Amino acid sequence: MIKNYKLLLFTTFTLFFITFVSGSSILKANFYYKVDWENVQCFVPPCPKYTIQKLNTNEKSQKILDFIFPNGLNKTTLLGDESKTLIVLGTTQPSSKFPNNATDFLVTRVYKSLPLGNKQTSTDKYYMFGDNGTRCKTSPCPNIVAALLNVHSQEIINTISQPYEKNVGFLDSVWLSSKNIRSDDFGLIGQGTIKNGVISISNSFIYLPDPPIKCPELPLLKCVEGNSMTYSRDENRCLVSPRCTKFGVCTLSIPLCNKGYRLVSFPSTELNGCPKFFCDPEFVNKTHK
């Protein structure tokens, strides 16, 4: 009886998760696409410079004139050559400028690849990940659902292996790990290959905007002499838990960030008021200095 109930619970979750990641919970016409761009020159409009390719399929690519993005996104990181780093969820529609001979793309969600991933392999596919509810006393534990985007197919895996902690200095591993497995819309898309229960990610695509929620406003504390305001940083890169901390002895070394990343710091409670440094992707919103 208990075994059958667990099987029913797992099956129900699985069906829900496949529906969620396929985009059919929004509109049946919504699919995930990789974007490409070429700076072609045309003598007569319209002049579509973008193409989209439906993920995990062999369908023919489509030419796109314009993208219609949701409000609140920094479009300078999304258009032109930058668009080659995007995955978009949405649907095509007739162009507002040339309805009879051009196509626009109405974007529901947009994801951008983290710089300095690994070179993609011929076996890589695109996945999103969920928790299947399995709990184990030993590891590895097969508790991760890897759902193939645009395809009603999935695999159960035990490990998500990211390349970025090796490739990028001072990356916030808590921030990245929090995006691997989510129950909301804000999880990452992983391009990778599954073997023996492990997916080796070549590139991760981050949901935009990031963070997806507004950081909380913090009170301004009055600290006694010899103390200063310090913080922690949560999985959304927001400063939290302000407190007065006695000054510590700080090192003077300041790290350099890899290309595509910017240096940020904050007075850390963990480091007794000394600055804690991270290298955040340049395309995410700043949450502090």
UniProtKB/Swiss-Prot annotation:
Glycosylation sites: N74, N101, N132, N285
UniProt-annotated location(s): Secreted
Keyword Secreted: yes
InterPro entries per record: DDB_G0275255-like
Keywords: Glycoprotein, Secreted, Signal
Recorded GO CC terms: extracellular region
Main location: secreted
Signal peptide feature range: 1-23
PANTHER family, alphabetized: DUF6748 DOMAIN-CONTAINING PROTEIN, DUF6748 DOMAIN-CONTAINING PROTEIN-RELATED
Protein name as it appears in the record: Uncharacterized protein DDB_G0275255
Species of origin: Dictyostelium discoideum
Phylogenetic lineage: Eukaryota, Amoebozoa, Evosea, Eumycetozoa, Dictyostelia
